[in-house]
Amino acid sequence: MDHLSIDLETFSSVPIQKAGAQKYIQSPDFEILLFAYSLNGAEPVCCDFAQGETLPKWVAEALLDPQCLKHAYNAPFEWDCLSRYMGRQLPPAQWRCTMFHGLYAGYTAGLDATGRALGLPEDKRKLNTGKALIRYFCVPCAPSKANGGRTRNYPHHAPERWELFKEYNRQDVTTEMEIERRLSAVPVPDFVQKEWETDLIINSRGVAIDMGMVEGALELGATVRNTLTTEAVKISGLSNPNSVKQLASWLESETGEEINGLRKDTVAKMLARDDNSPEVQRMLEIRQELGKTSTKKYDAIEQAVCRDGRVRGLLQFYGANRTGRWAGRLVQVQNLPRTYTEPLELARDLVKGRKLDALKCIYGSVPDTLSQLIRTAFIAAPGNVLIDADFSAIEARVISWLAGEEWRLEVFRTHGKIYEASASQMFGVPIDLIKKSNPEYALRQKGKVAELALGYQGSTGALINMGALDMGIPEEDLPDIVSRWRDANKRIRDLWYKVDAAAVQVITQGGSVGVSSIILAHEWDATQGTDYMTITLPSGRKLFYNAPQIGVNQWGNPSISYMGMDQTTKKWKRIETYGGKLVENCVQAIARDCLAQAIEHLEAAGLPVIFHIHDEVVIDIRPFADNEAMLAKTVEIMSRPVPWAPGLPLGADGWVGKFFKKD
């Protein structure tokens, strides 16, 4: 098997960060400028397309040769570009993505950052001149007197820069190959590689968009925003009432109190007070209305929609690399607002018809309504329907199975009412009494918040963050809820401490330790310079924790840490973890593997997935004769027993319709 490593430099007038790679590549002015390649580790060669060079015949043939694996960093981009160049969709099975391989091994997405994290020598690292060269040659430039009014820079405008750009192109191939060599000690399992290939196809399919809905929402949103801003200026006299600094200063002068920011929760708490002046109350209401992110999502859809009315590239495979879950991109479908508005069809018609007054009269807050309708902008293709199916309480099922908490598993095998069952176990009340007609039903709220907050070693702070106080639960009751939940779930509690102890053992002593259905191990390769704590999941996939260490935490106990990407600062740094967090990683990773397997089965059954969100899949397909039969087939596939997780009770539910919603 031959290996062809590739890196492309390209031009397009479409901004790739906002529009996505597929729309970028579909632009009429898109072109490949440079094509660097290396066969089987040879010195990289740069083919200068921009100056008339043509790709050697053997390279073009290699792009189609099943006996030649193509490697690239962020390979979906090269795959898309070269599929257009070759005039056909290249077989995904012939491609390998080094960026994904790095994410699989616990590193970051960036080529330079991953190279540094792996400790690549200077001559193997990405050149730091790249960003400036890309800005100069790969995107349009602003016309000026100095550049003769041109809107694009060509090689002849800066020959020395162009030669440096070619060197940069070749060096990216060198860096990619060195990273792949270092990662060869931790190969990607074949079934995970197949999932990557399926993801490539799903992202290239895209999702149909109701542009009438999007355009109507943008127009109505702008009208409402202008109206509210004008009103806010009139009330406050501020030049820019959307400015946090200006509004906070005004509120301080009106209330005589210090205002520490205007976050969503802060504004909500201030609105709940009964001593606000009418002016303050109205300004807070306007702030809350203007704070809706609805039009931002519609803006993102409009910027990313391709010529055929579909948005592509909504998901990044292994984007959440601590668990291997997908991450949302462009429109961020992973965090769309829920849909409570009813009837949805009427609301959508009013938005498409720009009926602002009617929308306000029937549904109240226009920004809130537009926010709830974002999901419905994703529609079935003409003549098709959407099938939506999602796993039921997947994380609660997985942690119950992993810990062997039998009473919980029995709940999921039968009625599935985990909130009621949890309250029953915690407070010793028969579950039959926990229903709306009885006073015991109040215990369900405590069971619910406990289930949502405490599964991963959370305590009273986790209950507060999950909204326990907002539910009316007194703060003094929280320690009792924590204690009762842990006593009712002894096997889950024990799992946290067993995993913590196993991690400490393998890091300090080496070897491997099995806990339930997972295996923790310390793996290193001196020749490649890699050092990991790994957790082998029941599926066979591994989670990687780079450069693990044991220190001492603030309570004087052993502290587990590893090198990883800080989700807040986006910097590579040492991160502390503990048993409950490791259990959370495992549970979410196992749930992810259940979803990935379901997607493979759905695809094999001729049910084309267009996107998915955590535990939910969306299919776009020609309707069957019977909608119920379509849904039943999908749910049956989602609920199939998992071979590597015997006894894990999966369940799913869903709907069939013309547009996306949260049922």
Give short role names for the model-derived ranges:
Residues S27-Y37, G41-S184, W196, E342, ...:
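Active-site-proximal helix-loop-helix substrate-binding element of RNase H-like nuclease domains
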Residues L183-E195, C594-V617:
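Active-site palm subdomain of RNA-directed nucleic acid polymerases
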Residues E258, S424, V429-A605, P649, ...:
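Conserved catalytic core of nucleic-acid polymerases
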Residues S12, P76-R88, A105, A248-S253, ...:
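Short active-site loop/helix that positions an aromatic residue
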Residues M630-S639:
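Short amphipathic alpha-helices in soluble, non-transmembrane regions
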Residues R622-E628:
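Helix N-cap motif at beta-to-alpha junctions
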Residues M1-D2, A60-L64, T369-V385, E600-A604:
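A short acidic-Thr-Gly-centered motif at the start of a beta-strand
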Residues M1-T10, V14-I16, L34-A36, D123, ...:
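Conserved "right-hand" nucleotidyltransferase catalytic core of DNA-directed polymerases
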